[in-house]
Structures are given as C-alpha cells and as structure tokens.
Amino acid sequence: MPRYVIINADDFGLSCSINRGIMEAHRFGTVSSASLMVNTPGFQEAVSLAKSTPSLGVGLHFNLTYGTPATNPLLVPSLVGAGGSFHGNQAEWTCRDIARELYTQYGRMLKHGLRPTHVDSHQHIHLDNPVVYSLVKKLVQYEELPLRLPSNRPDPELPWVTDELFMYTYDSQIGVPHLLSLLCKIPEGITELLCHPGYVDDDVRRLSTMTTAREEELFVFIDPQVVVCIAELQAHGILQVIHYGQFQAIRSVLTRGR
C-alpha cells in the first residue's frame, strides 16, 4: 500500500511571524497543510496567504483558550472572563456556548472565502473534553470533513481520519536526525505529522508558552537534509506529501484497493 504524509503546521494566524515561518516551510516543500486560528492577530494575513497559495491545505484550528472569542463575548459568557477574553476554565464551559463559538469560528473562515480542508483544535481540546468532541464530531460529519484523531482513539462513525498521527512537536528528540528517521518510518496509508514551526515575535510571547521551540522546529523543517530527503522519497515513489484537501480522494482509492 502507498505511504502518504500530511505535514501539518498548527497555529497558522497566531501572528505574522508564525505565518512567515509556516509559509517558508511550505515553500521548501516540507509543510503541506496548516490549521488556522480565526481570532488571533495574524488571521487576516493568513487568509491572504492561503488564498494566494492553493498548494497549502488550510483547516480550522478551533480555539477556546487564547484571545477573545469570534462570537460577541456577551453571547458566550461561560467561555470568557470579566475582560471578554477566554478564561480557559473548562469546568465553566456550557454546551450552548461551545457550539455557538465553534460555528462562529467555522463561519468566519467561510465568510473570508476559505472552506476548511479539515478540523482540529488548539491544545487538543476536542480530544480532552467530551462535550467539545461531540460538537466538533457533529460539525465534521455534517460538513464531511476530516478530523484529527490519534490512532489509539478510533471512531467508527468518522471515515475521514488518518491511519496514524505523529506529534513531532511533543517529541523530546526534536532535531534533523530524528525527523529524518520519522520520515523513513511513515507506515502504509495516510499519516499526519503535526508540527509548530514559526518565527517568534511579541504576539507569540504574549499568547503562547511555546516560543523558542517554534523556531527550532522551523529550522529543522527547512534544513537542506530534510528538504532533500522528502524530495528523494517522493521521487522514488516511497512517500507522497499531501494535504487534507486531497485526503478523501486518496482514502477512497486506498479503500477500493483493499
């Protein structure tokens, strides 16, 4: 069976410096997909970049923990603190407010001319919170979109899920040798390789605890050894880099071939 990998950069739109790093990695032929935050400082720029770069698949990075909601804060009171920003306390969230914010964020992408290629979430809240998961699941089922799920948490009701999920960002062995090793170990089927490349600016320092690690990842993904390795694996038909917008067609072919 063929081997496919989606190299997905999270936090597209977090800041202009993150956008710059993701686009640089994409131009180098490594990052093929990105997950867009719609309520962060770099959103408008990210939309323009996405529209001018159709080779980059762009999904929704559902966010309930950073910044202010896409919805009027008065309409989602359980999600925000006194200042109108997300407080991140899941114990206070209500199903109604989560659903309202989810569909507002999804709708904001559509209103800006982008149909998400997939859905995932910031800080994996759809995996950690059962209510969030049930709401996101309903959305992707209705819209027929892929959803990020690890292989140890399969959902038979969701057909558009990768066979494997490699969370490169959370691996203690970040570096060129380790990434080269991972690329050579991509299994048959479709795998997502999750990463967080980007440059760091004041917005990133204000909004995220992940700072220098982003630049470290970026330098790995644009390293000549990595770029050449991916190009050679593709040239020899060993591995194909795709994005989530190509997922369903490839999955259908793979399913028919079984």
Tell me what each language-model feature is.
Residues 1-6, 16-57, 65-118, 130-258:
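Terminal accessory/targeting
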Residues 9-12:
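DG-centered beta-turn motif at the end of beta-strands
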Residues 61, 122-124, 196:
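Histidine-centered divalent metal-coordination motifs
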